[in-house]
Amino acid sequence: MLARAPPRRPPRLVLLRLLLLHLLLLALRARCLSAEPGQGAQTWARFARAPAPEAAGLLHDTFPDGFLWAVGSAAYQTEGGWRQHGKGASIWDTFTHHSGAAPSDSPIVVAPSGAPSPPLSSTGDVASDSYNNVYRDTEGLRELGVTHYRFSISWARVLPNGTAGTPNREGLRYYRRLLERLRELGVQPVVTLYHWDLPQRLQDTYGGWANRALADHFRDYAELCFRHFGGQVKYWITIDNPYVVAWHGYATGRLAPGVRGSSRLGYLVAHNLLLAHAKVWHLYNTSFRPTQGGRVSIALSSHWINPRRMTDYNIRECQKSLDFVLGWFAKPIFIDGDYPESMKNNLSSLLPDFTESEKRLIRGTADFFALSFGPTLSFQLLDPNMKFRQLESPNLRQLLSWIDLEYNHPPIFIVENGWFVSGTTKRDDAKYMYYLKKFIMETLKAIRLDGVDVIGYTAWSLMDGFEWHRGYSIRRGLFYVDFLSQDKELLPKSSALFYQKLIEDNGFPPLPENQPLEGTFPCDFAWGVVDNYVQVDTTLSQFTDPNVYLWDVHHSKRLIKVDGVVAKKRKPYCVDFSAIRPQITLLREMRVTHFRFSLDWALILPLGNQTQVNHTVLHFYRCMISELVHANITPVVALWQPAAPHQGLPHALAKHGAWENPHTALAFADYANLCFKELGHWVNLWITMNEPNTRNMTYRAGHHLLRAHALAWHLYDDKFRAAQKGKISIALQADWIEPACPFSQNDKEVAERVLEFDIGWLAEPIFGSGDYPRVMRDWLNQKNNFLLPYFTEDEKKLVRGSFDFLAVSHYTTILVDWEKEDPMKYNDYLEVQEMTDITWLNSPSQVAVVPWGLRKVLNWLRFKYGDLPMYVTANGIDDDPHAEQDSLRIYYIKNYVNEALKAYVLDDINLCGYFAYSLSDRSAPKSGFYRYAANQFEPKPSMKHYRKIIDSNGFLGSGTLGRFCPEEYTVCTECGFFQTRKSLLVFISFLVFTFIISLALIFHYSKKGQRSYK
């Protein structure tokens, strides 16, 4: 019998190769899961340079196909039913019942009857009552059209004691009903296992998350959920916001369970949370992923931080701030299983150490990056020390880019994002809506412009609920809940309607009204520029000095005046004013056809009447205007505009009440008469008053101002129009007022009210009925304010129709809301909240850039006052004076002029001219087309851009034919005799020239002959 040979042992070399191969595979796996930490530090330098206005504004684009649109809620915030059907107590039940979570300023809620009710209970005992309203909640999801719904399971509802054992069947049934309803609607669930509501029994028995044993109990609870619900769930979140759980639950004690331990305890709890998460991830990965095919992650919250100055030190401090909040949990999971180096270097013994086996356990335990970004952590619960003296910022786009670079381009699912409004705000939540728009826009830019892999977005939250440490003092829901009602009906807010439309459009698709229009204006269109006040420099040139001087060439090298000897005085000429020619040169360089400026009443008539006329100033204006005409530039002259000091009035009038005094109107008519007589020969377009409708002007002053305008208009119409053939009107400031919530009828009414008070106040008497707007009168009577004067019938006849065209200045658009959200920006008089869309571009002085507002206000004026000839007599913005390229002004001018073109071409507005503001920085710092320094003017890039628009007479495209416009020249009336006799004058000049040459030759040769004879 042959003996069996013993099995051959693999040679030592083979074993070594297998070991090396195994190590290589582990290294490759680690490399796939990790990136070199610290790459995110590049983010600040990348975004340090201010973006071009086109990139900083709204991006008209859509999200990728298959993008996940979600909305979320949390069990304790919304479920209520805290004692129903066997639910156990959670740490939040205990925390709110014993210490109270809401701040002392919890609002007094007004019942429907109008009587004040007691403050809301500062607990989540009932909250939004979602436990008893599954159908109601899911109908809200159906209205929104979301693809995913994030909710959390209450650990204490399915396991009242927190430990594995007999589960609470009613609790399981509730979540099954919810999941089944979601399946019927085609909405995918995103389920959070732990959203801060630990069973109280586990806190009492083990000390909560401070005990490592809780990780195993959490694993058992997760296994129960995976087994019962996992077949219907593709996205799982293990723990929500571990930073808040650890730091504010066990270190500061601000949140449940309210343990005011040391920072060491906070770091220990975070350590245990990471281990608990990792165990659950491995449980799912091993036992449930093969059959259920889901994905598991942990929801990490973060702020964003900007350096105080762009120095290496400050950038390192910003990186450290993110390490201490987000990197605390993200680096162990997404990089190498260990804490950030900055934490280990700064915290020394406070930070627990991971064993090598724990590092392997934790590393790579996320199938996607679940990000939470919003007010709860980012701007309310962030520990001030973790800012490291840098500046917080609500910039989601930059945070997404940082995560992308720091953690090796993970797929990012934004699982919580939104803002909040006051607890008293009901359904018109404009502030929340615009923050939602901002965050979604930044997400879209991160995807389309930065290449970040964002797979989904979750608006927070579905409905109003209990807001943790803020109680019911704020609201974060897309649906309004009346907490005092029995049925707790969900009513969609403006934010819900906005989000529903955005999901339907899958983003912000390009719309026809957002596209630039190609086309041209009519040939006689007035292209102008504005200089509110030309610099009146009456310094005469050296040639007007009648004195005689000797040049002391041997000693002082100076001119010495010869006493008693004077030259004959000559008549002054316009060339004597050295300040005029440079301004004309600038205007000719711009190639504008019109120039608008205001006269200085106080300079011309220092005493306010014609007893003292400053003829030098008047002569300067006469020269300025006549030189404009000779340069083929049409002057547009305003008689008055409010300005400091004394509102632009002569001191004598200002000290006697200014426009409050009815005699000022008569003085204005007298002043206008002088200007018409002295300057009207060269002026075809007059403005009586430029932008008089300021909000700080009283109704009495406005009444007298209207009368003054009408007197001046009739004076011109009766005495000067026939000879001078000019036109005259008033120029009103007309910024557009837009309803903050486009879905709100209340906001539409408020916007119309503000338009009537801002524009209609002075426009309606002139261009409309001859009386003040009915809206104004009714509103003031309702407020028991009877200060608005009444016109007599004679005054109505005087004021009504006192115009030849409608002139408006337009700079920006303002949003108005009827809900009182920010007391600092609330107008109690008109009961209106002013605000802005935070996605709009803003100038350095915070003026919003909203081009479509110009088109809207022109259409509103046409609707109110008919098809009148209109001029935009001022439109412009300030820009960074230190920037070499005034790119914001270029963007502003291009888009506002294009909206004016749309009004002319598409809306058939009778638009006759457009005036850009302003000529130079000399009179309008930061707003000019020319920089001014040391008596030198330097054109900015925006000037050349505006000139190009003027040269094209609009916007020429590849398919746009330019309109042929023959060049016109201003007729010089004094030159009429010469213009009609050009040929005769040339012939006479030739004869005179020939005669002079002949005399010269005769004289020359006669002299020569005499010399020869001698």
From Swiss-Prot:
Parts of the chain on the Cytoplasmic side: 1004-1014
Q: Where is this region: Glycosyl hydrolase-1 2?
A: 517-955
A GO BP entry: calcium ion homeostasis
Membrane-crossing residues? 983-1003
Protein origin, superkingdom: Eukaryota
Reactions that this protein is recorded to catalyse: a beta-D-glucuronoside + H2O = D-glucuronate + an alcohol
Where expressed (tissue)?
Answer: Membrane-bound protein is present in distal renal tubules, inner ear, ependymal cells of brain choroid plexus, elongating spermatids and mature oocytes (at protein level). Soluble peptide is present in serum (100 pM) and cerebrospinal fluid. Expressed strongly in kidney, moderately in brain choroid plexus, and at low levels in pituitary, placenta, skeletal muscle, urinary bladder, aorta, pancreas, testis, ovary, colon, thyroid gland and adipocytes.
Provide the Gene Ontology terms for cellular component.
apical plasma membrane; extracellular region; membrane
Deletion consequences: Mice display a syndrome resembling to human aging, with short lifespan, infertility, atherosclerosis, skin atrophy, osteoporosis and emphysema. They have various metabolic abnormalities, including increased insulin sensitivity and decreased insulin production. Mice overexpressing Kl have increased resistance to insulin and IGF1, a lifespan extended of more than 20%, and generate fewer offspring.
Known Pfam families for this protein?
Glyco_hydro_1
* Glycosylation, residue list: 161, 285, 346, 609, 614, 696
How would you describe the post-translational modification of this protein?
N-glycosylated.
| Intervals, Extracellular compartment | 35-982
- What's an example of a GO molecular-function annotation for this chain? fibroblast growth factor receptor binding
Activity's dependence on pH: Optimum pH is 5.5.
InterPro entries from the xrefs? Glyco_hydro_1 (IPR001360), Glyco_hydro_1_N_CS (IPR033132), Glycoside_hydrolase_SF (IPR017853)
* Activity regulation info: Inhibited by D-saccharic acid 1,4-lactone and taurocholic acid.
Q: Which UniProt keywords apply?
A: Cell membrane, Glycoprotein, Glycosidase, Hydrolase, Membrane, Repeat, Secreted, Signal, Transmembrane, Transmembrane helix
Induction info: Induced by 1,25-dihydroxyvitamin D(3) in kidney. Down-regulated by angiotensin II and up-regulated by statins through modulation of the RhoA pathway in epithelial cells (in vitro). Isoform 1 (but not isoform 2) is up-regulated by thyroid hormone in adipocytes.
Q: Which residues form the signal peptide?
A: 1-34
Family of this protein: Belongs to the glycosyl hydrolase 1 family. Klotho subfamily.
Domain-related comment = Contains 2 glycosyl hydrolase 1 regions. However, the first region lacks the essential Glu active site residue at position 241, and the second one lacks the essential Glu active site residue at position 874.
What does the UniProt record say this protein does?
May have weak glycosidase activity towards glucuronylated steroids. However, it lacks essential active site Glu residues at positions 241 and 874, suggesting it may be inactive as a glycosidase in vivo. May be involved in the regulation of calcium and phosphorus homeostasis by inhibiting the synthesis of active vitamin D. Essential factor for the specific interaction between FGF23 and FGFR1. The Klotho peptide generated by cleavage of the membrane-bound isoform may be an anti-aging circulating hormone which would extend life span by inhibiting insulin/IGF1 signaling.
Subunit arrangement? Homodimer. Interacts with FGF23 and FGFR1.
> What's the name of the protein?
Klotho
UniProt source species: Mus musculus
Instruction: Specify the taxonomic lineage.
Output: Eukaryota, Metazoa, Chordata, Craniata, Vertebrata
* Gene responsible for this protein: Kl
